[in-house]
């Protein structure tokens, strides 16, 4: 935005009395000699349209898929921008409905999509954070916010501490300079406003309401291995460090023959192989021993994606017995927490004596899934209560969790990874290695079709390993 356009916009805002001088109590609780009331924009469609267009020109740190206006003044701005640029919009409810769908976020969206927050003005950043929190709880990525006016009172810094970059059309200092230049404010009043700004440069978020935790400083895998309470969790970190690989291949093939051949091809590049033994049409009792031999040869762990979801007694039998005898050959299994903590007790009863580990399904990568918010928080609580057996989580966007694990010993593995983001006809959502590791705070990328459908799975696995490990290294302090 050039200086002439900015000056014209400031004068137009003053002309519609959107800029006022006097004594005003702000949302942050402080008393201000200047107040910006952009609610008047709804009565001036031409100016509203111009502001929406100008906000679109502000550069975001990453491409975005959705818009979300902060309730309520920014909603018409976001709506106009959505229509002008054909960018879908979602809406945050200030309070979730107690009836109907009881949603906190309205609109069509998919976990992993990036949202640009739109606000009229920012003081402490509290309103933006209050909007970012429920968006992130739904698995959406919030990295940027655009605003008409930055009051320069700590909002930019508060948002940055919570992983959000603020982009503004103008600052309060620039507003004051233009109004003074055109005789719209006296020098005495301008001095009063400048003194007010100097005295209130760091306004904190009131009560930290809606604040998202600052992005945690990532510890290296070698250091985290020393923190692990479970031997398999420790070994996984050690394998990752030794092979410089945070790649897990999802071997979703139809026969044991195909799976064993794939394991030989990709084994040198992976830290873990994910199986679905119950889809193998030619399964035989010696399958586990054959796979373990390949895993030992190439130094990777075996993760049976069983997704246990029954009561403790039943999962104990499913784990140890049946025709698959998963306990005998799978280093790691996973489970839903729908039945409650008893499912972990049942699996631990058999798995812990053999040094096995468990991943809890805290989130899923399919569109419309219900594993988020309180469900995810419950998974974290159960994991911390069973940290001797639970080694981590199947996650989609752990950086957005409002309740994060207290220990970095827990590992995050994220499915639905491909070189290019997108989705399939059955609702699976794909994200890139860099996005999963850097933006979403995961540790392991789980890649299926991107490798197993490739003409050269070994070479493709190597490319994914290099990308995944590079993303991990770039995320370290």
Curated annotation (Swiss-Prot):
The active site is at 307. GO terms for molecular function: orotate phosphoribosyltransferase activity; orotidine-5'-phosphate decarboxylase activity. GO terms for biological process: 'de novo' pyrimidine nucleobase biosynthetic process; 'de novo' UMP biosynthetic process; pyrimidine nucleobase biosynthetic process; UMP biosynthetic process. InterPro entries: Aldolase_TIM, OMPdecase, OMPdecase_AS, OMPdeCOase_dom, OPRT, Or_phspho_trans_dom, PRibTrfase_dom, PRTase-like. In the N-terminal section; belongs to the purine/pyrimidine phosphoribosyltransferase family. In the C-terminal section; belongs to the OMP decarboxylase family. PANTHER family: OROTATE PHOSPHORIBOSYLTRANSFERASE, URIDINE 5'-MONOPHOSPHATE SYNTHASE. This is Uridine 5'-monophosphate synthase. It comes from Oryza sativa subsp. japonica.
């Amino acid at each position: 935005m050039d200086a002439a356009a900015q000056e014209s916009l400031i004068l137009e805002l003053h002309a519609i009395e959107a800029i006022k001088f006097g004594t005003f109590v702000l949302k942050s609780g402080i008393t201000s000699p200047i107040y910006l009331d952009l609610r008047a924009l709804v009565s001036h469609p031409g100016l509203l349209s111009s502001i929406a267009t100008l906000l679109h020109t502000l550069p975001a740190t990453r491409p975005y898929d959705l818009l979300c206006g902060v309730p309520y003044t920014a909603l018409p701005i976001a709506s106009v921008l959505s229509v002008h640029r054909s960018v879908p919009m979602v809406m945050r409810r200030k309070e979730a409905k107690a009836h109907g769908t009881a949603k906190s976020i309205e609109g069509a969206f998919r976990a992993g999509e990036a949202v640009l927050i739109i606000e009229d003005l920012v003081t402490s950043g509290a309103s933006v954070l209050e909007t970012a929190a429920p968006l992130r709880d739904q698995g959406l990525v919030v990295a940027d916010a655009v605003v008409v006016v930055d009051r320069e009172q700590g909002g930019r810094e508060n948002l940055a501490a919570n992983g959000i970059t603020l982009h503004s059309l103008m600052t309060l200092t620039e507003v004051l300079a233009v109004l003074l230049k055109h005789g719209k404010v006296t020098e005495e009043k301008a001095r009063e406003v400048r003194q007010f700004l100097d005295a209130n440069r760091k306004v904190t978020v009131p009560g930290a309401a809606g604040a998202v935790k600052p992005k945690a400083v990532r510890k290296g895998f070698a250091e985290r291995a020393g923190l692990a309470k479970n031997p398999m969790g420790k070994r996984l970190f050690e394998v990752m460090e030794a092979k410089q690989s945070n790649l897990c291949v999802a071997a979703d093939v139809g026969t044991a023959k195909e799976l064993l051949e794939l394991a030989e091809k990709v084994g040198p590049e992976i830290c873990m192989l994910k199986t679905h033994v119950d889809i193998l049409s030619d399964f035989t009792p010696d399958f586990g021993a054959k796979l373990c031999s390949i895993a030992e040869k190439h130094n990777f762990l075996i993760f049976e994606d069983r997704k246990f979801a029954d009561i403790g007694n039943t999962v104990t039998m499913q784990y140890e017995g049946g025709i698959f005898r998963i306990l005998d050959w799978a280093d790691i299994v996973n489970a839903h927490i729908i039945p409650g903590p008893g499912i972990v007790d049942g699996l631990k009863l058999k798995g812990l004596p053999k040094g096995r580990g468990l991943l809890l399904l805290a989130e899923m990568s399919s569109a419309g899934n219900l594993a988020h918010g309180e469900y995810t928080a419950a998974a974290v609580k159960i994991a911390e209560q069973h940290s001797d057996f639970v080694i981590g989580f199947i996650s989609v966007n752990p950086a957005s969790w409002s309740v994060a694990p207290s220990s970095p010993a827990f590992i995050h593995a994220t499915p639905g990874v491909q070189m290019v983001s997108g989705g399939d006809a059955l609702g699976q959502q794909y994200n890139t290695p860099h996005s999963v590791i850097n933006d979403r705070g995961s540790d392991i990328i789980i890649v299926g079709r991107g490798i197993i459908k490739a003409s050269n799975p070994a070479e493709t696995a190597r490319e994914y390993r290099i990308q995944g490990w590079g993303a991990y290294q770039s995320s370290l302090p």
